[in-house]
């Protein structure tokens, strides 16, 4: 049995729209069992198929059709349509499965390029594959990526609402055009945030994480709890609160001691959901073989 384990991811980190992302210690696990005559996908999601039409198998087939079907078991801690990279994790699991079963010998760089091409942007797939926190850009031909350090004591307090928010719906909330001056401001904020994060300048990062210009203001009507959580978090010494990916999940970054205090403060939000705390996953996608 081959086991592929892919972490959840949180994209944007505030102003790093479609470019910044980090991996969290929630996981999708794909187990590849015995060969079969047709694809069998065993999972507990009521609305997903159990055959060749499952997204993981379809992702694998984008690389090659020269694969013997197998019995697959999918287990996931990553909630669907919540802004935590569930589709990116499934995509990478499928591509990695194809790489193994068809002996394609693709490098991680080649897997990343294929995943980014299918996803359209690298901010989820890059940290899911490589682990840690990553800044990345895709020009339509090549993926450029570089990691940056986040200290061990930083905890991610993750509020996951009970409702789904499809990425397409969240994308539709964004304008087709953007004012030039606001674009410059957004770019400058993002650039400075990356430099601050790369240099462990948390005082500067703290002032910039909540200054996004590109998407949070346009999506706040879809995620009213963002401002509510941000207001509560400001009463503690946190680094910042941001919309994870397209939402509706909201994440607050804070040192461990402050995170412990923050958690019970988020128990009575007006939006129903659950709050968990995660660490940065530094290993990314892993493959193990078991007898």
Curated annotation (Swiss-Prot):
Disulfide bond residue pairs: none
Subcellular location: Cytoplasm
Gene Ontology molecular function terms on file: ATP binding; homoserine kinase activity
Pathway entry: Amino-acid biosynthesis; L-threonine biosynthesis; L-threonine from L-aspartate: step 4/5
Binding site for ATP: 79-89
EC number: 2.7.1.39
Sorted UniProt keywords: Amino-acid biosynthesis, ATP-binding, Cytoplasm, Kinase, Nucleotide-binding, Threonine biosynthesis, Transferase
Official protein name in the record: Homoserine kinase
Gene: thrB
């Amino acid at each position: 049995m081959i086991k592929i384990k892919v972490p959840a991811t949180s994209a944007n980190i505030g102003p790093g729209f479609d470019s910044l992302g980090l991996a969290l210690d929630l996981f999708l696990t794909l187990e590849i069992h015995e060969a079969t005559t047709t694809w069998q996908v065993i999972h507990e999601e009521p609305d997903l198929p159990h055959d060749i039409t499952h997204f993981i198998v379809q992702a694998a087939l984008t690389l090659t059709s020269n694969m013997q079907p197998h019995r697959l078991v999918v287990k996931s801690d990553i909630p669907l349509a919540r802004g935590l990279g569930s589709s990116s994790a499934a995509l990478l699991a499928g591509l990695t499965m194809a790489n193994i079963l068809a002996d394609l010998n693709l490098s991680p760089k080649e897997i990343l390029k294929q995943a980014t091409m299918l996803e359209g942007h690298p901010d989820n797939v890059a940290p899911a594959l490589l682990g840690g926190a990553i800044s990345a850009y895709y020009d339509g031909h090549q993926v450029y990526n570089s990691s940056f350090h986040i200290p061990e004591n930083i905890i991610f307090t993750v509020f996951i609402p009970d409702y789904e928010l499809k990425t397409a719906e969240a994308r539709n909330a964004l304008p087709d055009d953007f004012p030039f001056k606001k674009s410059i401001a957004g770019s400058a904020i993002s650039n400075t945030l990356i430099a601050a994060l790369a240099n462990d300048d948390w005082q500067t990062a703290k002032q910039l994480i909540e200054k996004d210009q590109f998407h949070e203001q346009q999506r706040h009507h879809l995620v009213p709890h963002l401002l509510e959580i941000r207001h509560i978090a400001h009463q503690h010494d946190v680094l910042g609160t941001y919309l994870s990916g397209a939402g509706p999940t909201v994440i607050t970054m804070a040192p461990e001691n402050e995170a412990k205090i923050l958690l019970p403060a988020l128990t009575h939000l007006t939006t129903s959901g659950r709050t968990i705390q995660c660490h940065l996953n530094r290993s990314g996608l892993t493959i193990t073989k078991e007898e």
